[in-house]
Curated annotation (Swiss-Prot):
Cell compartments where the protein resides: Cytoplasm
Name of the molecule in the record: Exodeoxyribonuclease 7 large subunit
Lineage of producing organism: Bacteria, Pseudomonadati, Pseudomonadota, Alphaproteobacteria, Rhodobacterales
One BP term from GO: DNA catabolic process
Role, per record: Bidirectionally degrades single-stranded DNA into large acid-insoluble oligonucleotides, which are then degraded further into small acid-soluble oligonucleotides.
An annotated GO cellular component: exodeoxyribonuclease VII complex
Length: 482
């Protein structure tokens, strides 16, 4: 029996696996999927009993027509190999195909229900398309008939500025590139060097469900739903339906139809504008003619201008005739009024008025003589003296009355206070905390006693409680303290 080292037996196993199987196809359900930072894709293919580890290297990930997704039933093609350092075998996959359209349709239906539950298909989310966009952004492959059809149709209908964002329209790179293109157009600023489009078109020609699968990826649907720019989806033919069709603002059956939705026909628009202009001119001409005829009808109903001025001219003539007499009468009335107002200003009247004012001033001056002031001061002094005497008498009476009330209250306090009771032979007992003791049991429990008599206080120590004895008969003349 030959003897092998670990490295030797691992190498033999690797050579046996690779030589015996070579390139193989394996059918199973995709399990765990993980893409490393390096770009390599690691996943499992499993059935109800076993699991096969698979790897797709970074350079081959982009060429996959279907990206492995957990739960998807696929057929993978690759080469079986072994890793001696880990004692594991692995399938290096370079091609992934869906095991059947039924699996893809089930996955598509699952995604549709999820996105619909989130409200991404709601009609109220869909925005109207701009009537005549200035700039149209097209997301598609830069080669092929799709972009040529769109540009040709736009040029025929109404030439617009078009920005093309080239993307892969199938394969593993399709979904991330389309999502990045939608997000990228939305990041353009309206006034930037590269202006922001007013409308987006995501377009691709027809193909199998596997070819169109990139437009069924969740990342594409969410990017289209989040777009702030109105978006038309034109993926596949009229019978092809993808997830992006449900979240876009409008769905076009073909890329050519998307271009027709985007812009009106320029010639039709010019013809319509010309027709509307002609209608407006005819309407304006008719309106002017109607107004002119109406003006002529109204002018015939008006009187002649000369007849309108006859009556005012007669009133003016009569007023001119009365004007000189009216001026003379006005001057006479003003003269009479002036004479009436100037009568009190005669010299005799002025002298009488001045004399009366002098007599009044003399009377006032006599009241300000020194003797009159002395008499007034003396009278006010006597009045002040009388008021001072009355105030002193009232204060003395008030003070005496309050003193008597205070003495009476003090006598009542002494009568009702416990000091008077102490003077009759009673005492107040407190503990060392100053609390009042009213029973023998309280006094027995106290650590120290403080006894207050009428003439002072005595401090004494406490004593244990003694058995209760028959109380002595109180003297009949001694009353209760409380």
């Amino acid at each position: 029996m030959p003897e092998f080292t670990v490295t030797e037996i691992s190498g033999e196993v690797k050579r046996t696996l690779e030589g015996s199987f070579g390139r193989i196809r394996v059918r199973g359900e995709v399990g765990r999927v993980f893409q490393a930072r390096s770009g390599h894709l690691y996943y499992d293919i499993k059935d109800d009993r076993n699991v096969l580890a698979c790897t797709t290297w970074k350079g081959q990930v982009a060429s996959l027509s279907v990206v492995p997704e957990e739960g998807l039933e696929v057929v993978v093609t690759g080469r079986l190999t072994a890793f001696g350092a880990q004692s594991k075998y692995n399938l290096n996959v370079d091609e992934v195909a869906v095991a059947g359209q039924g699996a893809l349709m089930a996955l598509l239906e699952k995604r549709k229900k999820q996105l619909e539950a989130e409200g991404l298909f709601a009609p109220e989310r869909k925005r109207p398309l701009p009537y005549l966009p200035q700039i149209i952004g097209v997301i598609t492959s830069p080669q092929g008939a799709v972009i040529r059809d769109i540009l040709h149709r736009l040029r025929d209908r109404f030439p617009r500025k078009v920005l093309i964002w080239p993307v892969a329209v199938q394969g593993a790179n399709c979904a991330p590139e389309v999502a990045r293109a939608i997000e990228g157009f939305n990041m353009f600023s309206p006034g930037g060097a590269l202006p922001r489009p007013d409308l987006l078109i995501v377009a691709r020609g027809g193909g199998s469900i596997e070819d169109l699968w990139g437009f069924n990826e969740e990342i594409v649907a969410r990017a289209a739903a989040a777009s702030q720019i109105p978006l038309i989806s034109a993926v596949g033919h009229e019978t092809d339906t993808t997830l992006i069709d449900f979240v876009s603002d409008r769905r076009a059956p073909t890329p050519t139809a998307a271009a027709e939705m985007a812009v009106p026909v320029r010639l039709e628009l010019l013809a319509w504008t010309g027709e509307q202009g002609a209608r407006l001119s005819r309407a304006a001409s008719d309106a002017v003619q109607r107004r002119a005829q109406r003006l002529r009808d109204l002018s015939r109903a008006l009187p002649r201008p000369d007849s309108l001025l006859d009556t005012p001219r007669q009133r003016l003539d009569r007023a001119a005739e009365r004007l000189p007499a009216a001026l003379t009468q006005g001057v006479q009335r003003r003269r009479l009024r002036l004479a009436e107002l100037s009568a009190p200003l005669r010299p005799a009247s002025l002298r009488a008025l001045v004399s009366a004012r002098r007599d009044h001033l003399a009377h006032l001056g006599s009241r300000l003589s020194p003797r009159a002031l002395e008499r007034e001061i003396a009278a006010q002094g006597e009045r002040l003296t009388r008021l001072s005497d009355r105030l002193n008498s009232a204060q003395t009476t008030r003070i005496e009355r309050l003193r008597q009330r205070l003495e009476s209250a003090d006598r009542l306090r002494e009568t009702l206070g416990y000091k008077a009771t102490l003077a009759r032979g009673y005492a107040v007992v407190r503990d060392d905390q100053g609390a009042l003791l009213t029973t023998r049991a309280q006094a027995a429990k106290a650590a120290a006693l403080q006894i207050e008599f009428a003439d002072g206080t005595l401090d004494t120590g406490g004593a244990p409680a003694k058995p209760a004895s028959k109380p002595k008969q109180k003297p009949p003349e001694q009353g209760s303290l409380f």
